[in-house]
Amino acid sequence: MKVLIIGKNIKNVYLSLDAKNFELDKNQNAHLDLVYDGGEKYYNDRFSIMTGQKLANEVISNFRIETETAFSPENPETCDDFQYILLSKNNYINLAPEFVKQCDFNSKILEKRTAKFDYLYIDWSAELNNVQIKTILDYLESHPKTKLAWCFDRSELPKLLSAPDLSKTNLTTFYRLLQRAEIVFVMGKKSQMMRVKQVLSTLSTLKLIYVTENQILAGVFKEDFRNKDIKVTRDVAATIIAGTTFSALITDWNLQRALMLAKINVENSKANKTLKINQLSDKLREALAIR
């Protein structure tokens, strides 16, 4: 089994803030002045990890699946988007910088004659443009046995929800690529789930896994989850859940067990370390003994 992971390397920079520096307004909402004077430090601790493609690669590799990555600089630490995450007690806020570095999609990896993959896995971080989508579609059309898994985050929901009839031909490249998907992960509100199901209903062989703030839903199965580590933010949790479920499904776990493994992984992982398959299997046996 060989998987090509397509996504960006994203650096999360966590700043732990001291609650005493916050000011409360008349409505008891907390505010913090983040104008730095060059000398005063507003945070107690600083910690950073790589997410996006790199985290997805770790999760999938932990299932002993062979992987390659499409955004492949020699040193991924030097080519990534990044965001600050402000931590205070049990809450966090994401701050995206105005200017970020952009990773280059290594399309040559799909042009090699030796490039044979069982699955292409598009992480939510990929943010593909039309040229990149066309490259992926061309590869799939010339490799009909290669399957596609695709993760959509909240920012991509409008495009997904406005999809035309996916049973038709002559669609744009984005929707033609969607037609090829065997597994789709969608991160969104539970209220939007039925509309997503309706849009994708014509893709009869598709497995849809829907992830909300605290639930994983697929078919008749549902798993509630809770992030025990505040550094496992929404985006990190989505990467762990999607990567775990995908890996379990393609290594012959059934859907119910795949969702249970995803719940276990997201609840027991640290932001910089996820569980290996033997650890997941042990914790799954413990969970089944309790249920």
Task: Label every PLM stretch briefly.
Residues 248:
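Internal, well-ordered alpha/beta segment that forms a basic, Gly-enriched binding/recognition surface
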Residues 1-37, 44-236, 251-291:
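Ribokinase/PfkB-type carbohydrate-kinase core domain
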